[in-house]
Amino acid sequence: ESCDYPDYAHPLAKAVEAGEVYPGIAICGSGNGIAMTLNKHQGIRAALCWQEEIARLAREHNNANILVMPGRFISQEEATHTVEAFLSTPFEGGRHQRRIDKIPL
């Protein structure tokens, strides 16, 4: 059944921004629309990930605070590994923090 991803993205982003939820996890068809919507929120760094290594890099280098996965293009097994990688990987900081500090307009 079709749904409007902004109806889910905005409450999730607000919950992460408020510190009520950390990190956030979203699953959508391709993941693109919900990731774009999430990233409209100040302080949100939603990363579209479909493999473990992408999820690790999203945390290590980008300090992503919401994991977005493409439900149509990821198996349940790969989704499980991707979530585990995202949740267990710390942010490296250093030069990556400097880059993140340059994101807000």
What are these regions (language model features)?
Residues 15, 37-41, 85, 102:
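Alpha-helical structural signal in soluble globular domains
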Residues 9, 31, 35, 79-80, ...:
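A general structural signal for well-ordered alpha-helical segments in protein cores
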Residues 1-5:
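Short beta->alpha junction loops
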Residues 26-72:
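Mid-chain, well-packed structural core segment of small domains
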Residues 52-105:
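C-terminal binding/interaction regions
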